[in-house]
UniProtKB/Swiss-Prot annotation:
Catalysed reactions listed for this entry: a quinone + NADH + 5 H(+)(in) = a quinol + NAD(+) + 4 H(+)(out)
Organism for this UniProt entry: Bordetella petrii (strain ATCC BAA-461 / DSM 12804 / CCUG 43448)
Localization per Swiss-Prot or TrEMBL: Cell inner membrane
Membrane topology summary: Peripheral membrane protein
GO cellular component: plasma membrane
Biological classification of the source: Bacteria, Pseudomonadati, Pseudomonadota, Betaproteobacteria, Burkholderiales
Oligomeric and partner information: NDH-1 is composed of 14 different subunits. Subunits NuoB, C, D, E, F, and G constitute the peripheral sector of the complex.
Function: NDH-1 shuttles electrons from NADH, via FMN and iron-sulfur (Fe-S) centers, to quinones in the respiratory chain. The immediate electron acceptor for the enzyme in this species is believed to be ubiquinone. Couples the redox reaction to proton translocation (for every two electrons transferred, four hydrogen ions are translocated across the cytoplasmic membrane), and thus conserves the redox energy in a proton gradient.
Family listed: Belongs to the complex I 30 kDa subunit family.
PANTHER family per UniProt: NADH DEHYDROGENASE [UBIQUINONE] IRON-SULFUR PROTEIN 3, MITOCHONDRIAL, NADH DEHYDROGENASE UBIQUINONE IRON-SULFUR PROTEIN 3
Molecular functions (GO terms): NADH dehydrogenase (ubiquinone) activity; NADH:ubiquinone reductase (non-electrogenic) activity; quinone binding
Protein's UniProt name: NADH-quinone oxidoreductase subunit C
Length: 209
């Protein structure tokens, strides 16, 4: 029986990395969960193994799972395919031009207070600015990156704006000061507004009648 392309990729991944790898399939796509201490070794294997040949990283981003589940998670859901889940994750999307298939690879930064994973720049040089963006927006540190500095926010920006606990109004704002004849920074003057609608529902709301 002929295997589908997805089945072939799954077979090749297990052959290269071991049968007990943390692999999930959803919506016709494979996601490989990798512990942070194996991140560099596994990604290098994905690129160099002839049966995989993921020579291109087309995207890399950070994710903040601070409010994931909103308290509804069940026991055991702190792990994904056997890999320990934490607040911050790094997700890479890989492409094999030779085999015409794709793979999503995710790792979890073990320390929520100082999230850090290894840089993939030696494996795929094109992730340089992707990792800088994840550092800028999420505060994820990529160990070994040769030029890890902000890339989107302004000089002197405080905080990381894509974190779930970053205030929507920010922390500082800038304006032109006519007396100093230059643009200055000052604490944000926007008053936060929280509007909670008052909803009155019947006791039987949503139940079949």
């Amino acid at each position: 029986m002929t295997m589908t392309r997805l089945e072939t990729l799954k077979h090749n991944l297990q052959a290269a990395l071991g049968a007990d790898i943390a692999l999930t399939e959803a919506l016709g796509e494979l996601t490989l969960e990798v512990p942070a201490d194996q991140w560099l070794a596994v990604c290098n294997k994905l690129r160099t193994d002839a049966g995989l040949s993921f020579e291109t990283c087309i995207d890399l981003c950070g994710v903040d799972y601070l409010t994931w589940g909103n308290g509804t998670r069940q026991a055991g859901e702190d792990k994904v395919a056997g890999v320990q889940r934490s607040r911050y994750a790094v997700v890479a999307h890989l492409l094999s031009i030779a085999h015409n298939w794709r793979l999503r690879v995710r790792t979890w930064a073990p320390d929520d207070d100082f999230p850090m994973v290894g840089s993939l720049i030696d494996c795929w040089p094109g992730v340089n600015w992707f990792e800088r963006e994840a550092f800028d927006l999420f505060g994820i540190v990529f160990e070994g990156h040769p030029d890890l500095r902000r890339i989107l926010t302004d000089y002197g920006f405080i905080g990381h704006p894509f974190r779930k606990d970053f205030p929507l109004s920010g922390t500082v704002e800038m304006r032109y000061d006519p007396e100093q004849r230059r643009v200055i920074y000052q604490p944000v003057t926007i008053d936060p507004r929280e509007i909670t609608p008052r909803v009155v529902r019947e006791d039987s709301y949503g139940l079949g009648r």
